[in-house]
Regions:
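Extended active-site neighborhood of metal-dependent phosphoesterases/phosphodiesterases
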Residues: 51-132, 140, 174-175, 204
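Beta-strand-turn-beta hairpins that frame and shape the catalytic cleft
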Residues: 1-5, 100-111, 138-145, 205-209, ...
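N-terminal active-site segment of His-dependent metallophosphoesterases
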Residues: 1-59, 77-80, 97, 132, ...
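Active-site environment of divalent metal-dependent phosphoester hydrolases
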Residues: 13-15, 43-47, 71-82, 117-121, ...
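Conserved beta-sheet core of the metallophosphoesterase superfamily
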Residues: 162-238
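Short acidic, glycine-rich surface-loop motifs adjacent to enzyme active sites
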Residues: 142-159
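Active-site neighborhood of phospho(di)ester-bond hydrolases with catalytic His/Asp-centered motifs
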Residues: 6-8, 35-40, 64-71, 113, ...
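A short C-terminal boundary segment appended to hydrolase-like catalytic domains
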Residues: 233-270
Length: 270
């Protein structure tokens, strides 16, 4: 089995040292093969916050890391930088690519930069981005788990979170499902959940899963959701059509992340 650790919404500048230490221990225990950082790495997109965030990600010692920016990762108050070079600090710490992909014999992973400098917090996906991901998915083999990573969610469970849903989510979900995607990962709202999109999007003819992550190490937690991360386990040969998403929550009393929930994803091959 291969393991993918998804961490999101770290918001460095609001990080908690005890939670960071617990996440480091979790990573050492589980030894994931891939680390996915799904946006909002910092609180205010400063070089110092990005530097600390990168050092922490490196300390997890995961062989392959994929990251993408969130809305907090572009300057808020420096309007010149926000317009002219919104990703400069992010790219200095995490690399030039804003939409990196990862291709291995068992994984086809595509990322989408859903941030826009002219939007304060809402994200959007363009037709060009949708098409680019579809092209990537079209080259995937039946042995590869096919994952798309965004920042803002393509599905929300509660009416009060609807305004945070990704703009353009519906054509994206329909196109990516038709192109063969298995999982869409996201963050942004600090609320972890797993759901089958074919149960909520009418006319979707193929099984597609939404996997949302909470906030990994930030003090900006929801009252109903502690710090959490997701661990996705998938076979070396995805023809074995079962994957597992484990949600690990931070328990303050024990000072460690503990398994809180587990969902089996039945992956469809047509």
């Amino acid at each position: 089995m291969r393991k993918l650790l998804q961490i999101s919404d770290m918001h460095f500048g609001t990080e908690q040292l005890d939670v960071m230490a617990a996440l480091l221990a979790l990573s050492q225990e589980n030894k994931p093969d891939v680390l996915v950082v799904s946006g909002d790495i910092t609180q205010r997109a400063t070089a110092e916050q990005f530097s600390r965030a990168r050092a922490f990600c490196d300390s997890l010692r995961v062989a392959q890391m994929i990251s993408l920016p969130g809305n907090h990762d572009i300057p808020l108050f420096n309007l010149f930088s926000r317009v002219m070079s919104p990703y400069a600090a992010y790219q200095k710490a995490f690399g030039h690519a804003l939409e990196p992909d990862l291709i291995t014999p068992s994984l086809c992973l595509a990322t989408v930069n859903t941030t826009r400098w002219w939007r304060h917090k809402n994200g959007e996906v363009s037709k060009a981005q949708i098409d680019r991901v579809c092209e990537q998915l079209s080259r995937a083999t039946s042995q590869q788990l096919r994952v798309v990573v965004v920042h803002q969610p393509v599905h929300v469970l509660r009416p009060q979170d609807e305004h945070d849903r990704l703009r353009g989510w519906e054509p994206a979900v329909r196109a990516w499902a038709a192109a063969g995607a298995d999982v869409v990962m996201g963050g942004h709202i600090h609320l972890p959940y797993v759901c089958e999109l074919s149960d909520t999007v009418s006319g979707l003819k193929r099984r597609l899963w939404c996997v949302q992550a909470g906030t990994a190490v930030s003090s900006r937690i929801r009252r109903e959701a502690p710090n959490s991360v997701n661990l996705l386990e998938f076979p070396d040969d995805a023809n074995n059509l079962r994957c597992c998403v484990e949600r690990w929550d931070y328990q303050k009393a024990g000072g460690r992340f503990e398994l809180a929930d587990s969902s089996v994803l039945n992956v469809q091959r047509i």
